[in-house]
């Protein structure tokens, strides 16, 4: 019998961002996503184990209480309105002339409107818009316009702006100016997100002399989440019963089969899933799995497995409004559970030659999903948290007056297939009793297919609204944010108390990304969303997100090095160089890998 508990506490504060300021300022956040988080996390894991060797039984109880509290912070100071207008080179005289009825500066806009009405080419209108803006803000960059839009979204404008046309000042001009000059008055209160997680698992195991054993148990988990953004409380309960039977035959063949039945609910939705049994629906969802492992010879193993999968959307995916890295997570009450199955066939072979020994493994896998849950990035109306999916939606957002948000919403992909193979080897070469080389090499090939892409493309080809969101950046058959090939190698040379190691990571290009970021389809001229992307994601010296991604969405490899020494039994030091070759790479749009980084680490064991 043994029992005890583990306790963890973590407090951190960090800045992160999902959208860059521009291709020329890739490591600076966009003003729309200038956010970080500070958080405190506490966890206690009690456990109790009792084993009776004479009866071949064991009882295990595991528990967990987890609490987290975090809130949004701004890691960098937002620019003031005077700084923004100064950076844009604002021509006050031009603004005064317009107020006095001299519209010469707006001539490019008027010309563009006339050309657009005659040619129906959006580029004529947009050239006129930006031509007039250049007269007012001659030094402005796309990032400066983002600063201005972000400032207006945060501070608002005086009411009764329409009265200026009649020579009347807004009635709340003085309070508004006071807020501009004293921005601390406009700071929003801290909005803290809190999460409570209670978990309990009981497991019973019985072994027989003939090589059979059975494992069964019960699991209960209760989660309570408070959103500081919407001031809503959501609760979920997950109850599961499981059983697995294992049998070994002839000292070579091991067979296992198991079933798990789950009940899940959120708030008052007591039946998140149903299963029909003898014509009646019960609120439990069973999943099955089975596998076998056969020892062909010494250090040679053949394995096969099959398992069903079922996952209910989490509270965050379905109900919460949350900011992560400055990008909002928006609720989708219609997201459904994802389900599927996975099959794998593998072969593992041990080898030894002199001082070299290790294992090689080859496996093929196939996974199929129905209603697979994926996130989709887009623009959202902060008034009702809905996705902006048309010009009408955008107009409604402007009327609501709470601005727009950039974020992600979880939704279902009707059908997905992911299959491929994995080859790996790991082992050790011993030079002498003081020196050895450890290695781990692995290659993965994946085909991540959207099985319904043709049907979706046919539907998207009927879209006529210029702001209607499509699923991904191209018409291809692949799922978003997945490469086809990846390779990883880890080497560690150990000599007495010294170790020298290296990591090599290689990945192929990304196959597709979100439509809001890029549209890789061929077109005769830019559409409205291309201009929206140009403002939101910036441009620098003619470089846009699209051109940057086209240049950097390629195969890439990174190399990390480390050197360590164990000074005493309790104290060890390690010096690391990450991205040794200072490779510039991008693993998703606006996510540029960290440059060469030096890290010093000390480990102390008590």
Predicted regions located by residue number:
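Transmembrane beta-strands of outer-membrane beta-barrel pores
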Residues: 9-13, 65-71, 220-226, 231-233, ...
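Face-selective signature of the C-terminal outer-membrane beta-barrel domain
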Residues: 2-14, 34-273, 361, 420-425, ...
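Outer-membrane beta-barrel channels and translocator barrels
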Residues: 2, 51-56, 209-211, 248-254, ...
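Gram-negative outer-membrane beta-barrel transporters
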Residues: 251, 363-368, 386-516
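Membrane-embedded beta-barrel scaffold of Gram-negative outer-membrane proteins
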Residues: 60-64, 295, 301-305, 336-407, ...
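Structural signature of Gram-negative outer-membrane beta-barrels, strongest in the C-terminal barrel
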Residues: 195, 207-215, 219, 223, ...
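C-terminal beta-signal and adjacent terminal beta-strands/loops
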Residues: 310-311, 371, 377-380, 505-546, ...
């Amino acid at each position: 019998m043994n029992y005890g508990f583990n306790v963890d506490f973590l407090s951190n504060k960090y800045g992160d961002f999902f959208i860059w300021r521009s291709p020329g300022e890739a490591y600076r956040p966009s003003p729309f996503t200038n956010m970080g988080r500070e958080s405190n996390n506490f966890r206690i894991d009690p456990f109790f184990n009792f084993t009776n060797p004479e009866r071949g039984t064991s009882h295990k109880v595991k528990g967990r209480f987890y609490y987290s509290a975090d809130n949004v912070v701004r890691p960098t100071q937002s620019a003031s309105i005077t700084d923004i207008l100064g950076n844009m080179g604002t021509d006050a005289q031009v603004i005064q002339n317009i107020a006095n009825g001299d519209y010469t500066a707006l001539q490019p806009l008027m010309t563009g409107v006339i050309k657009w009405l005659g040619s129906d080419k959006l580029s004529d209108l947009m050239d006129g818009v930006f031509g007039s803006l250049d007269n007012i803000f001659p030094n402005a960059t796309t990032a400066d316009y983002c600063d201005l839009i972000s400032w207006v979204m945060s501070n608002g404008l005086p009411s009764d702006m329409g009265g200026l046309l009649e020579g009347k000042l807004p009635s709340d001009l003085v309070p508004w100016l006071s807020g501009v000059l004293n921005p601390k008055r406009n700071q929003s209160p801290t909005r803290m997100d809190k999460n409570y997680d209670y978990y309990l698992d009981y497991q019973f195991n019985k072994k027989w002399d003939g090589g059979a054993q059975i494992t069964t148990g019960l699991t209960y988990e209760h989660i309570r989440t408070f959103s500081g953004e919407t001031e809503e409380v959501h609760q979920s309960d997950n109850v599961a019963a499981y059983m697995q039977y294992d049998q070994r035959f002839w000292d070579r063949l091991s067979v296992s089969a198991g079933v798990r039945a789950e009940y899940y609910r959120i708030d008052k939705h007591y039946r998140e899933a149903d299963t029909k049994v003898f014509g009646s629906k019960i609120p439990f969802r069973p999943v099955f799995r089975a596998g076998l492992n056969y020892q062909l010879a010494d250090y040679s193993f053949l394995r096969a497995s099959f398992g069903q999968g079922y996952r209910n959307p989490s509270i965050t995916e379905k109900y919460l409004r949350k900011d992560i890295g400055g990008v909002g997570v928006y609720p989708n009450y219609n997201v459904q559970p994802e389900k599927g199955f996975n099959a794998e066939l593998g072969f593992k072979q041990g080898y030894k030659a002199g001082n070299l020994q290790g294992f090689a493994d080859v496996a093929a896998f196939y996974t199929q999903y129905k209603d697979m849950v994926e996130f989709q990035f887009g623009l959202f109306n902060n008034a009702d948290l809905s996705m902006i999916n048309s010009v009408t939606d955008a107009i409604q957002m402007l009327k609501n007056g709470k601005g727009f948000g950039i974020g992600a919403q979880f939704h279902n992909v009707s059908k997905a297939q992911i299959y491929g193979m994995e080859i790996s080897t790991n082992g050790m070469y011993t030079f002498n009793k003081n020196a050895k080389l450890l290695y781990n090499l692995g290659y993965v090939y994946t085909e991540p297919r959207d099985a319904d892409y043709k049907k979706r493309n046919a539907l998207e080809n009927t879209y006529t609204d210029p702001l209607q969101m499509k699923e991904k950046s191209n018409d291809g058959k692949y799922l978003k944010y997945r490469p086809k090939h990846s390779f990883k190698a880890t080497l560690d040379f150990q000599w007495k108390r010294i170790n020298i190691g290296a990591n090599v990571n290689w990945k192929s290009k990304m196959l597709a990304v979100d439509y809001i970021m890029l549209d890789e389809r061929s077109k005769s001229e830019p559409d409205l969303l291309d201009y929206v992307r140009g403002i939101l994601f910036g441009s620098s010296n003619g470089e846009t997100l699209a051109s940057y991604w086209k240049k950097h969405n390629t195969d890439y490899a990174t190399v990390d090095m480390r050197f360590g020494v164990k000074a005493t039994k309790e104290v060890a030091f390690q010096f690391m160089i990450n991205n040794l070759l200072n490779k510039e790479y991008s693993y998703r749009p606006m996510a540029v890998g960290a440059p060469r980084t030096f890290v010093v680490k000390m480990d102390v064991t008590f």
